[in-house]
């Protein structure tokens, strides 16, 4: 219904890549907190980093359905790999497509799609999480430059970034209408990073604070129009929700796979636990939730590909897929019993990785607000 033969070929390509290149190193990445640069390079070479980016910028020019299929398959092998995949296609690529100049696309977007440049999306602050409009980072005009001061927190990929997309207040009196987007060089004077967070999951893509102290940014590195940064941020996050939702699908599918395999192998009372109705009902509920979530994600991607407004559908997909994935992984761990609590089993990693999906790029509560606001218009 949602996919063409071409989409299915893309899915197979992503699945084969994930099984051959990512699955074998996923547990080691979780232990060492280092994702191999050669795998990142291979993902870029396979066209994954620009799957839905226009061909003129080095992308594949595919659609949102192609993107979610790849996200699903890559995340099935590793949620962390899904982060590396989603960034150029979503949080980091979208702002350039929306408001970037030709020069900015040439300088930042193209190298990012090729896997040669890494960026970070710096919106969240200690006092501005779900209330993104409350950013306190300031940008003061000084001739041909703006001087940035502030602190960003929980920024994915910050310590390994070459450049940072920073949202700062250029007019303190206008609230969300006084926020501007800047492109900042990670290595320039005044930019520093906090200690990488000791995270529960998604280990292998570092997360840290970014400290900006009198950072001098030329006006040519303003991304979009002055005081229009909040609009850019919100549009970017809206587009990105289906990617995160697809990431949830991949992790949930991996959990179902592990639970089915374990239930068939594990014997109690002289027979596989898969023969017990209690386990069968749990597996049935997991599979039903997963397929319901898939339909929501695929429908949102399809509507976006048709050029229809899909804010509500994207939020429904992100909300339901995230919450369902958490429940599915929890049930899969329960099926494993005590072994599910041991790091030698994949389900333990999935349990830690999946939890953040209901938090980042818009919490489940924010998604509910978006859904409700669309209903009550």
From Swiss-Prot:
Cysteine pairs bridged by disulfides in the record: none
Domain of life: Bacteria
PROSITE patterns associated with the record: ACYL_COA_DH_1 (PS00072), ACYL_COA_DH_2 (PS00073)
Enzyme Commission code(s) on record: 1.3.8.15
GO BP term (any one): L-phenylalanine catabolic process
GO MF entries: acyl-CoA dehydrogenase activity; flavin adenine dinucleotide binding; oxidoreductase activity, acting on the CH-CH group of donors
Catalysis: reaction(s): 3-phenylpropanoate + oxidized [electron-transfer flavoprotein] + H(+) = (E)-cinnamate + reduced [electron-transfer flavoprotein]; phloretate + oxidized [electron-transfer flavoprotein] + H(+) = (E)-4-coumarate + reduced [electron-transfer flavoprotein]; indole-3-propanoate + oxidized [electron-transfer flavoprotein] + H(+) = (E)-3-(indol-3-yl)acrylate + reduced [electron-transfer flavoprotein]
Cofactor requirements of the protein: FAD
Keyword Oxidoreductase: yes
Job description of the protein: Essential for the reductive metabolism of L-phenylalanine, L-tyrosine and L-tryptophan. Catalyzes the reduction of phenylacrylic acid to phenylpropionic acid, 4-hydroxy-phenylacrylic acid to 4-hydroxy-phenylpropionic acid, and indoleacrylic acid to indolepropionic acid.
Protein name according to UniProt: 3-(aryl)acrylate reductase
Organism for this UniProt entry: Clostridium sporogenes (strain ATCC 15579)
Gene from which the chain derives: acdA
């Amino acid at each position: 219904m949602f996919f063409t033969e071409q989409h299915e070929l893309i899915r197979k390509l992503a699945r084969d890549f994930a099984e051959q290149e990512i699955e074998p190193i996923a547990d080691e990445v979780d232990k060492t907190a280092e994702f191999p640069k050669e795998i990142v390079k291979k993902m870029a070479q396979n066209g994954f980093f620009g799957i839905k980016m226009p061909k003129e910028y080095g992308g594949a020019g595919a659609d949102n359905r192609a993107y979610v299929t790849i996200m699903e398959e890559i995340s099935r092998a590793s949620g962390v790999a899904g982060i590396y995949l989603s960034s150029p296609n979503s949080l980091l690529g979208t702002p350039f497509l929306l408001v970037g100049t030709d020069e900015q696309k040439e300088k930042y977007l193209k190298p990012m799609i090729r896997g040669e440049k890494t960026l970070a999306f710096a919106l969240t602050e200690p006092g501005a999480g779900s209330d993104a409009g409350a950013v306190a980072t300031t940008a003061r005009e000084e001739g041909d430059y703006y001087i940035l001061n502030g602190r960003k927190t929980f920024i994915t990929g910050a310590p390994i970034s070459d450049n940072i997309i920073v949202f700062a207040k250029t007019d303190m009196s206008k609230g969300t209408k006084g926020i501007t987007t800047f492109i900042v060089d990670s290595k320039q004077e005044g930019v520093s990073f906090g200690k990488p967070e000791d995270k529960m999951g998604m280990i292998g893509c570092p997360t840290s604070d970014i400290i900006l102290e009198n950072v001098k940014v030329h006006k040519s590195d303003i991304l979009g129009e002055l005081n229009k940064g909040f609009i850019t941020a919100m549009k970017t996050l809206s587009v990105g929700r289906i990617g995160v939702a697809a990431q949830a699908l991949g992790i949930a599918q991996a959990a179902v796979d592990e639970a089915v395999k374990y239930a068939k192998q594990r014997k109690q009372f002289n027979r596989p636990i898969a023969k017990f109705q209690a386990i069968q009902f749990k597996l049935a509920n997991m599979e039903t939730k997963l397929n319901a979530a898939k339909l929501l994600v695929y429908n949102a991607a399809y509507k976006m590909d048709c050029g229809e407004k899909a804010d509500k559908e994207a939020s429904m997909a992100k909300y339901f897929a995230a919450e369902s994935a958490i429940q599915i992984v929890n049930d899969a761990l329960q099926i494993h019993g005590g072994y599910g609590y041991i790091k030698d089993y994949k389900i333990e990693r999935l349990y830690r990785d999946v939890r953040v999906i209901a938090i980042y790029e818009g919490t489940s509560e924010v998604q509910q607000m978006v859904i409700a606001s669309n209903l009550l218009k």
